[in-house]
């Protein structure tokens, strides 16, 4: 029961309740694939832009295409031009309109402000005469002249207003024609007075600043003793009271009194030599066993006295009686002589054979 209750909603409630679907033809219900006799709805005319109509058959007059390829457009005989096209007048296009108003060119180099007693009409005529004479179209039109005269009249009205303002400004109490008398300031003197000298900026060198007498304070008592470096006698100077002494440098500010000549001149401490270390007779080198001889470094080996009277190669010339050389003793029995092993070998003791 558990399995049935868990899965009964999958298919049991949907039996007989499936969706009702109606299959349609690939081309629709009115497609002629299945032999339908229903009338087709007319489709809108779609222009094929890839097709050419040069060699096409002649169409009806109502559907004929009058536009041909190329920069120029031609029309068939009997065809009317397209609607909405205006007629072109060659005369107006080439020579302009016959009744075109005159447009006088403005002369920017001349001023329109009139000076003198001319009236408005004379000023307008003078302005027409001073123009460059360039006109667009045919001259002799009275309307253009009247328009220019009216514009000149407006300019004269504006200029007259500005001239009146200029006249009022020129008659003001502060103008040049009516100057206001100046009143002298009583605080300002008539004679010029020198001003306070400017303080130089801090970056100016001291040599550029003018010298000023500055009061010097009390002189220390030590400076009264010596005021020059060569005051003392050079004969009584020593290294102890000179500038080369590191312990007592020679200074002008702190100087000692004159030296007492009754005291003996003792040498400086840096000139004294240290006493030599006493030699210990029992000091020996632990490696060689020789004495250090008091030098504390290692000592020297004792020199062995050598007898240089004989020839070490041949053995001749040595004094008899020494341990290093013995004469050969011949046997009294006449036998083989006894060779002393202590004799000097041939080649000497320095030979590599021995």
From Swiss-Prot:
| InterPro entries on file | JUPITER
Q: Compositional bias (Low complexity) spans?
A: 139-152
Spell out the subcellular localization from the entry: Nucleus; Cytoplasm; Cytoplasm, Cytoskeleton; Cytoplasm, Cytoskeleton, Spindle
Per its UniProt record, what Pfam families does this chain match?
JUPITER
Which Gene Ontology terms cover its molecular function? microtubule binding; structural constituent of cytoskeleton
Task: Indicate where this protein is primarily found.
Answer: nucleus
Annotated disulfide bonds: none
Extract the ranges annotated as region (Disordered): 85-107, 135-187, 222-257, 287-354
Q: Where is the composition biased (Polar residues)?
A: 153-180
Spell out the family assignment given in the record's similarity comment.
Answer: Belongs to the MAP Jupiter family.
Q: What is this protein called?
A: Microtubule-associated protein Jupiter
Species name: Drosophila ananassae (Fruit fly)
